[in-house]
């Protein structure tokens, strides 16, 4: 009988990415892989798109809020239903372990696995735990963290960032699509790549639209999330979404302007890519991006600019400062010890699963 592992996590791409890195490794080693999530969530979309041999189990989901809302009442019942569904799934499958990447959908499966005596392993990407992982921590066997946590928690293992991206990713691969973009760009100008993510692209899109003079100073690549903005013209490439072209565009850029999501930040760190962080504020998130950005700035990896301060004058000043001190930023990033390979983490996780099973 093959070993079985349950994955969960969703709500944003960041809550799925690491799972999609680990799943093929388990499949290759003969594990039967199952995933618990929201059938309308991005986790289901990404699993379907991956083509991996994974059985998806849909459960009811409700959002966990730190503030009062009448919707909390309805969501309590959704979470309760999700827990019952998760208990049934875990009891039926009898997996060796559950791995959670967080997000609201992950709490019921984590609780269910713990109640049924299954080891629970969680990964936290941000400087501080989100509400879902704070709850899940109580039921976890081990929590792996990208950042060193300020609170000394007994179940936490500081891992560093797990990414497939490394310094050699700066080598630009051959691409006919990329060659077409280069024809519109000037070799005499620095190339900037704007990455806003699913929640933060709009501000960058508007900033570029409001300041056409940017095209006179830089080559601009703008991943917009909006197909209506697609454009390839002199010194400007706007595209709604990229997959295979993402890494070539990243390598092509002299500097990346990004939000403060940890996955992207650590990809940039792994590549030693010069970057400016414009984090989402507390009005658009729980403040995790502000913490991530401050951490990166204090470590000397990057410079940050708060969204309310994103004016053309401040932006140009930030660009000048970053390019003036480019060698210092790159040297600091190259010296980092905060990056781990997927193989390293997979081996660690497998060893911890084996230890947890033996201790039962």
Swiss-Prot record:
Assigned keywords, A-Z: Cell cycle, Cell division, Cell membrane, Cell shape, Cell wall biogenesis/degradation, Glycosyltransferase, Membrane, Peptidoglycan synthesis, Transferase
GO cellular component: plasma membrane
Single biological process term from Gene Ontology: regulation of cell shape
Catalytic activity of the protein: Mur2Ac(oyl-L-Ala-gamma-D-Glu-L-Lys-D-Ala-D-Ala)-di-trans,octa-cis-undecaprenyl diphosphate + UDP-N-acetyl-alpha-D-glucosamine = beta-D-GlcNAc-(1->4)-Mur2Ac(oyl-L-Ala-gamma-D-Glu-L-Lys-D-Ala-D-Ala)-di-trans,octa-cis-undecaprenyl diphosphate + UDP + H(+)
First-level EC class: transferase
EC numbers on record: 2.4.1.227
Localization terms from the record: Cell membrane
Family: Belongs to the glycosyltransferase 28 family. MurG subfamily.
Main function: Cell wall formation. Catalyzes the transfer of a GlcNAc subunit on undecaprenyl-pyrophosphoryl-MurNAc-pentapeptide (lipid intermediate I) to form undecaprenyl-pyrophosphoryl-MurNAc-(pentapeptide)GlcNAc (lipid intermediate II).
This protein's name: UDP-N-acetylglucosamine--N-acetylmuramyl-(pentapeptide) pyrophosphoryl-undecaprenol N-acetylglucosamine transferase
Species, as recorded: Streptococcus pyogenes serotype M5 (strain Manfredo)
Gene behind the chain: murG
């Amino acid at each position: 009988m093959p070993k079985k592992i349950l994955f969960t996590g969703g709500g944003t791409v960041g809550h799925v990415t690491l799972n999609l890195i680990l799943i093929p490794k388990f499949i290759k080693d003969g594990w039967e892989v199952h995933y618990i999530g929201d059938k309308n969530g991005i986790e289901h979309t990404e699993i379907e798109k991956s083509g991996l041999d994974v059985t998806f189990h849909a459960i009811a989901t409700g959002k966990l809020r730190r503030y009062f809302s009448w919707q909390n009442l309805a969501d309590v019942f959704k979470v309760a239903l999700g827990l019952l569904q998760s208990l049934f799934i875990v009891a039926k499958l009898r997996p060796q372990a559950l791995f959670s990447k967080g997000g609201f959908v992950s709490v019921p499966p984590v609780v269910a696995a713990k109640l049924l005596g299954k080891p629970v392993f969680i990964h936290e990407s941000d400087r501080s735990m989100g509400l879902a992982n704070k709850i899940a921590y109580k039921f976890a066997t081990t929590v792996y963290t990208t950042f060193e946590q300020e609170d000394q928690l007994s179940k936490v293992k500081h891992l560093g960032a797990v990414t497939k991206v490394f310094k050699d990713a700066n080598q630009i691969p051959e691409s006919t699509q990329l060659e077409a973009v280069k024809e519109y760009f000037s070799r005499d100008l620095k190339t900037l790549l704007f990455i806003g993510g699913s929640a933060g692209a709009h501000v960058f899109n508007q900033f570029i639209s409001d300041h056409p003079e940017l095209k006179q100073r830089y080559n601009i690549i703008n991943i917009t999330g909006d197909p209506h903005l697609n454009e390839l013209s002199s010194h400007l490439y706007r595209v709604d979404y990229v997959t295979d072209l993402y890494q070539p565009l990243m390598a092509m850029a002299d500097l990346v302007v990004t939000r403060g999501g940890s996955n992207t930040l650590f990809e940039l760190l792994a590549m030693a890519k010069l970057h400016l962080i414009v984090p989402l504020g507390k009005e658009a998130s729980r403040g995790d991006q502000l913490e991530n950005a401050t951490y990166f700035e204090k470590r000397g990896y990057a410079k940050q600019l708060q969204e309310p301060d994103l004016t053309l004058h401040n932006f140009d000043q930030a660009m000048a400062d970053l390019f003036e001190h480019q060698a210092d930023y790159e040297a600091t990033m190259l010296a980092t010890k905060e990056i781990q390979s997927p193989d390293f983490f997979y081996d660690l996780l497998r060893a911890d699963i084996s230890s947890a099973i033996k201790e039962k």
